[in-house]
């Protein structure tokens, strides 16, 4: 698959449209699950296996503010590539 500019902007718009605020203020803090679910859908459509993992070290999580990590893998050989990024916004 060759990446294209319209495809990039479509995904960028979709990511920006999903709220994922991390805040010490409990009134603002929300889950990043909508972003993780979207990314998993995109990766799975491209042949990746995805695993959602609860983020360690976060206290007092409820379903409304649960923080998740996404691990997407493809292939089984030695070596590989790791990409890491944030899926939340901080006010």
Regions inferred by a protein language model and the residue ranges of each:
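Acidic/His- and Gly-rich active-site-bordering loop/insert found
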Residues: 2-91
């Amino acid at each position: 698959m060759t990446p294209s500019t319209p495809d990039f902007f479509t995904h960028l718009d979709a990511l920006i449209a999903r709220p994922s605020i991390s805040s010490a203020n409990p009134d603002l803090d929300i889950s990043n699950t909508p972003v993780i679910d979207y990314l998993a859908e995109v990766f799975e459509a491209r042949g990746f296996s995805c695993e959602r993992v609860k983020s360690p070290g976060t206290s007092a999580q409820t379903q409304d503010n649960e923080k998740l990590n996404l691990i997407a893998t493809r292939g089984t050989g030695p070596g590989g590539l790791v990409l890491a990024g944030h899926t939340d916004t901080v006010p």
